[in-house]
Regions:
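Noncatalytic, basic helical substrate-engagement surface that gates or grips nucleic-acid strands
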Residues: 1-129, 133-155, 159, 233-236, ...
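Conserved RNase H-like, two-metal-ion catalytic cores of nucleic-acid enzymes
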Residues: 3-4, 8, 14-51, 69-70, ...
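Non-catalytic nucleic-acid-binding/docking modules located in mid-to-C-terminal regions
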Residues: 49-53, 98, 121, 140-144, ...
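Active-site-proximal helix-loop-helix substrate-binding element of RNase H-like nuclease domains
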Residues: 152-176, 183, 328-459, 483, ...
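Conserved "right-hand" nucleotidyltransferase catalytic core of DNA-directed polymerases
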Residues: 230-349, 361, 424, 429-604, ...
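Function-dense linear segments that define catalytic or interfacial modules
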Residues: 371, 385, 389-417, 427, ...
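Conserved catalytic core of nucleic-acid polymerases
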Residues: 464, 576-577, 581-584, 659-792, ...
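C-terminal polymerase-core module
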Residues: 483-490, 494-546, 713-761, 765-767, ...
Length: 848
C-alpha cells in the first residue's frame, strides 16, 4: 500500500505566494485554490497512491507553544486573501472525496510523522509532500519526502539527504538544535549558522556529542564560548524541532481511502470559482440544466438551402476522450454554424466560400482563423461581422482562457438546446448576445467597432503577407556569432584554468568566486548569483567577466534569433508571424513564431538583426515610429502645463525636464542630467520608486528620493494625475484608457503591501500604456484602409511596439511614408499632438 500525505498549510502557502493573483469576476481570490489543486493533481498523476491524507494545522496552540512562549511568535498572520480561500478549498477537497486530518494540540508536521511511522511499522510506502525542509528528518527506507520548491518537486530519500547535507535524516534535528529556525522563532545557538551546525554534527554526531567534546580542538574558542553560553537554548531547540510521531489520529489501513464525496457539488463549486479547467482533469462533469431538446446536425450540403442571413460560427474545441471535455465525434469537420436553432457542420472548403459571400453575415466567435482562411483563398472575409472572443477579451483581459464553455459558465448561460456533436452550439448565440450587451453597458462599443474588430482583419492580412528575410545573411551572421562564441569560451577557460559548463550558474559561480576570488555580490539557494546585474558590477575586477557577458549575448542572439528565425522562414522566403490580439492585459499586441516584439535593438550586434528583414526587388520598407508617445499622452492626460509646453514648443522633453528641475537653461543641461531626467520621466510612468530609480541611475536611494520629490514639485500636474488615477481605481476597482478600455485591478484591495503596491503601479501605467496601444491599433486600421482606398500595392507588414512598417514598391514609397505619418499623427486630436517620423530603406535597419 502506498500512502500520500500532503502538508496542507505548507503547500497552500506555496501556491498562494507562487501564483499571480487570480480572482473571479466578482472579486473572490482563487490563486491558492487553483495552485493547490494543480499540485495535488500532479502528485496523483506522478505517484498513483492508494490512499491520500491532507494534513492541516489548527489555530489552537500546540504543545510546543505551551513549552516555549516565543514559538512562531514572529510569524505574521495569514493574509486575508488566503484566509478567505481556505474554507472553500477544504470544502472542495471534501466534495472530491479526499480525507483531511488535523489534531488539536499537534501540528501538521506531527501528523506527517505519525502517518509515516505507521506506514514504516507495516512496511508500507509513504510519500510526504511538503515545502517545509523540517520534514526531511522523516526520510527513511519506507518514507520519501516530496519537497516542493519554486521550480520542481524533489524526491528526498535518506540517500538524497546524505548527499545534500552530509548527515543522516534524523541528525537534521541536531543540526536545527544548533542553528535554530528563524521562521519558527526557534533560538538555537546564537551565532551558529547552517554551515557550522552541519560541521559539528558531521564530526560529533549529536548535540550531546558536541557538548561531550566541547574542548575538542575542532571547536574553535569563539564557537566554544557560544555553545557554552546557549546550551539550554540548544536543548530546547532540539525538543521544539523534533517531529513527534505519536499524534492521536487514525493510522489504520483504509482510513484515508478516497470517499464518494459529492462530484456534482465539486463541479458546481469549481464553476462558481471560474476554474473550469480543473473539472475535466478531476474527472468531473459540469453541472448544467437539462436541455429542452436535442438538435441534429445538418450536413454541409444543406447549407445552400439557407445560404443567406445571419450565422453564428465557431470551431469545436480540440479534445480527446482521455481529457473528457467533450465527446469525440466521427466527423472531419471542426467548424459549425448556428442559425434559427439549426446546427450545420462545416467543412473548411464550404466555410471558405461563405467568408466573402454578400448574402450572409457571419457572427464569428473567433474571427482570426476565418480571416486567415479568407486571405489564403484570395478574399478578405467581408462576411464576418463580429468577434465574440474579442468581446470577451475587452470585458476581462485577465481571463485564463476564452473558450465558449468557460465563458458561458462565467456568465451563467445554459443552452436552450443540446447538440452532442457540437456541445457548445446551444451556448453560442446567447453568450455572444450577452457579451455584446456588456460591451455596450461598459462603454466599449466604439473601441470594439472602430479598433479591435477591424484590426483582426488587418492582422490576418499582415500574417498572410509576411515579411521577406535575408536567409543567407542570417546564416552568415550565425556563423560569425558561433566563431565569437568559441573565442569567448577559449579566453574564459584560459583565465579560469579549466573547462566547465558556462551555462551552469553553480559552476560559473565556483569559477568566478572560488577559483578567481572575485567578491560575491549575493547568493541564491543553489549558490552564488551570476545574473546579469551581478556580472555587470564585477566588470572592473577581471576582463573575464566582460567575456562572459559577451558570451551570453552571442549565445542569446544565435539560439533565439538566428536559429529561431531560420526555423520559421516559409517556402516563399518570408516570415509569417502570428499577431496575438487577446494576450496582453494592457491591450498591447504580441506575436509568436517569431516574437517580433523582442527583436533586440539596444546593442549594436542586436540591432543588426533588423538588417535581415528586407524588401523584395523593386520595393522598399517604410518605417514610421511614434516619438515619445507615452510621455505625450501623460502630458495630455495630466494637463501639466510645463510638460505640455515643452512638447508644444518642440523642445527635447528630457532636456526640458532637467532644465525645469534644476532651474537652468536648456543649453546648460549636461548629458548626465538629461539621462537622469529621462530615467525619471519613464520611471514615474511605470510607478518606480526611489529604490528602483537608484539602481537605474547608479545613485543612492536618498539621492533618488530627492530626485523624485524635485520632479513631482516641478510637474505638479503629473503628481496630481497619478494620485487621482490611483484613488479612482481603488473606488471603481478598475482603470480605463482614454478610449474606454478597462482593466480590473483587484490587487488594489489587497492587504498585502507588495500586492497592493503592484496594483498601484499598474493603475499608474495602464491608462497611458493602454491608450498608446489603442492608438497604434487605430493607426494600423486607418493606414491599412487608406492604402487600399488609394489603390496602392503597398502593404502593412509589421508592427513592433510603437512602429509600423509598410512594404512599398519604389514608386509608392514616398506616398506610403506620407500616409503613415498623416494617419498615425491624426488618428486622435489631443492637447499634445502626436509626432511621427517616417523613413525609407532597403531593409528594416536602414528604414529605422
Amino acid at each position: 500500500m502506498k500512502l500520500l500525505v500532503l502538508d496542507g498549510n505548507s503547500l497552500v502557502n506555496r501556491a498562494f505566494f507562487g501564483i499571480k493573483v487570480l480572482t473571479t469576476k466578482d472579486g473572490r481570490f482563487t490563486n491558492a485554490i487553483y495552485g493547490f489543486m494543480n499540485i495535488l493533481l500532479n502528485l496523483l498523476k506522478a505517484h498513483e497512491p492508494d490512499e491520500v491524507a491532507i494534513a492541516w494545522d489548527l489555530k489552537a496552540p500546540t504543545f510546543r507553544h505551551k513549552m516555549y512562549d516565543g514559538y512562531k511568535a514572529t510569524r505574521h498572520g495569514m493574509p486575508p486573501e488566503l484566509a478567505q480561500q481556505m474554507p472553500v478549498l477544504k470544502q472542495l477537497l471534501a466534495d472530491l472525496g479526499f480525507v483531511s486530518v488535523s489534531c488539536e494540540g499537534w501540528e501538521a508536521d506531527d501528523i506527517l510523522g505519525t502517518l509515516a511511522a505507521a506506514c514504516a511499522a507495516r512496511k508500507d510506502d509513504c510519500l510526504l509532500a511538503t515545502g517545509d525542509r523540517d520534514s526531511l528528518q522523516l526520510a527513511s527506507e519506507t518514507t520519501t519526502i516530496l519537497l516542493a520548491t519554486n521550480k520542481e518537486t524533489i524526491p528526498m530519500d535518506p540517500q538524497a539527504v546524505r548527499e545534500k547535507y552530509g548527515v543522516e535524516p534524523r541528525q537534521l534535528i541536531e543540526v536545527k538544535s544548533l542553528m535554530g529556525d528563524s521562521s519558527d522563532n526557534i533560538p538555537g545557538v546564537a551565532g551558529i549558522g547552517e554551515k557550522t551546525a552541519l560541521m559539528l554534527v558531521q564530526n560529533f554526531g549529536t548535540l550531546d556529542g558536541v557538548y561531550a567534546h566541547i574542548d575538542d580542538p575542532r571547536i574553535k574558542p569563539g564557537m566554544r564560548a557560544k555553545l557554552n553560553a546557549h546550551k539550554a537554548e540548544a536543548e530546547l531547540s532540539r525538543t521544539l524541532g523534533t517531529i513527534v510521531c505519536e499524534a492521536p489520529i487514525e493510522t489504520a489501513p483504509g482510513s484515508y481511502a478516497r470517499q464518494p464525496g459529492d462530484p456534482a457539488a465539486a463541479a458546481k463549486l469549481l464553476s462558481e470559482l471560474e476554474i473550469q479547467t480543473l473539472i475535466p482533469r478531476l474527472g468531473l462533469t459540469e453541472a448544467k440544466a437539462a436541455p429542452r431538446r436535442e438538435l441534429p446536425v445538418h450536413a454541409a450540403e444543406a447549407m445552400p438551402l439557407l445560404a443567406e442571413g445571419d450565422y453564428y460560427v465557431a470551431m469545436r474545441p480540440a479534445t480527446t476522450k482521455k481529457e473528457g471535455v467533450h465527446n469525440v465525434i466521427d466527423t472531419p469537420s471542426c467548424w459549425y454554424a448556428v442559425q434559427n436553432e439549426q446546427v450545420f457542420a462545416l467543412e473548411e472548403a464550404r466555410l471558405t466560400t461563405l467568408l466573402d459571400d454578400a448574402a450572409v453575415r457571419l457572427h464569428a466567435f473567433d474571427s482570426a482563423p476565418l480571416y486567415a482562411m479568407a486571405f489564403a483563398a484570395g478574399g478578405e472575409g467581408k462576411s464576418i461581422c463580429e468577434d465574440g472572443k474579442l468581446a470577451a477579451y475587452l470585458l476581462n483581459p485577465s481571463a485564463r482562457d476564452y473558450l465558449v464553455s468557460t465563458l458561458a459558465d462565467a456568465y451563467g448561460i445554459e443552452g436552450e438546446f443540446a447538440c452532442p456533436e457540437f456541445p457548445d452550439a446551444g451556448l453560442l448565440i446567447p453568450l455572444m448576445q450577452r457579451m455584446n450587451a456588456q460591451v455596450d453597458q461598459q462603454g466599449m462599443r466604439k473601441l470594439m467597432d472602430e479598433i479591435e474588430f477591424p484590426l483582426a482583419q488587418v492582422l490576418a492580412d499582415m500574417t498572410h503577407t509576411g515579411v521577406l528575410v535575408d536567409e543567407e545573411g542570417i546564416r552568415s551572421f550565425g556563423e560569425m556569432l558561433r566563431t565569437e562564441l568559441e573565442g569567448c569560451l577559449d579566453r574564459i577557460y584560459e583565465a579560469v584554468g579549466y573547462e566547465f559548463n558556462l551555462n551552469s550558474p553553480k559552476q560559473l559561480g565556483e569559477a568566478l568566486f572560488d577559483k578567481l576570488g572575485l567578491p560575491p555580490r549575493k547568493k541564491t539557494r543553489s549558490g552564488y548569483s551570476t545574473d546579469a546585474e551581478t556580472l555587470e558590477s564585477l566588470q572592473n575586477y577581471s576582463p573575464v567577466v566582460s567575456d562572459i557577458l559577451q558570451y551570453r549575448l552571442y549565445q542569446k542572439l544565435n539560439s533565439t534569433y538566428v536559429e529561431g528565425l531560420l526555423k520559421v522562414i516559409g517556402p516563399d522566403g518570408r516570415i509569417h508571424s502570428n499577431f496575438l490580439q487577446t494576450e496582453a492585459r494592457t491591450g498591447r499586441l504580441s506575436s509568436t513564431e517569431p516574437n517580433l516584439q523582442n527583436i533586440p535593438i539596444r546593442t549594436e550586434l542586436g540591432s543588426r538583426m533588423r538588417a535581415f528583414f528586407v524588401a523584395p526587388e523593386g520595393c522598399e520598407l517604410v518605417d514610421a515610429d511614434y516619438s515619445q508617445i507615452e510621455l505625450r499622452l501623460l502630458a495630455h492626460a495630466s494637463g501639466d502645463e510645463a510638460m505640455r509646453e515643452a512638447f508644444l514648443q518642440g523642445r527635447d522633453i528630457h532636456r526640458s525636464t532637467a532644465a525645469k528641475m534644476y532651474h537652468i537653461p536648456d543649453e546648460e543641461v549636461t548629458p548626465a542630467l538629461r539621462s537622469s531626467a529621462k530615467a525619471i520621466n519613464f520611471g514615474i510612468m511605470y510607478g518606480k520608486g526611489a529604490f528602483s530609480l537608484s539602481r537605474d541611475l547608479g545613485i543612492s536611494v536618498k539621492e533618488a528620493d530627492a530626485f523624485l520629490k524635485n520632479y513631482l514639485d516641478t510637474f505638479p500636474g503629473v503628481d496630481g494625475y497619478m494620485r487621482s488615477t490611483i484613488a479612482d481605481a481603488k473606488e471603481k476597482g478598475y482603470v480605463s484608457t482614454l478610449f474606454g478600455r478597462r482593466r480590473a485591478l483587484p490587487e488594489l484591495s489587497s492587504t498585502n503591501f507588495q500586492v497592493r503596491s503592484g496594483g498601484e503601479r499598474m493603475a499608474r501605467n495602464t491608462p497611458i500604456q493602454g491608450t498608446a496601444a489603442d492608438i497604434i491599433k487605430l493607426a494600423m486600421v486607418r493606414v491599412w484602409r487608406r492604402l487600399r482606398a488609394e489603390g496602392m500595392q503597398s502593404r502593412l507588414i509589421l508592427t513592433v511596439h510603437d512602429e509600423l512598417i509598410v512594404e512599398a514598391p519604389e514608386a509608392e514609397a514616398a506616398r506610403a511614408a506620407e500616409i503613415l505619418q498623416h494617419e498615425m499623427e491624426h488618428c486622435v486630436n489631443y492637447s499634445v499632438p502626436l509626432s511621427v517620423e517616417a523613413k525609407i530603406g532597403r531593409n528594416w535597419l536602414q528604414a529605422h
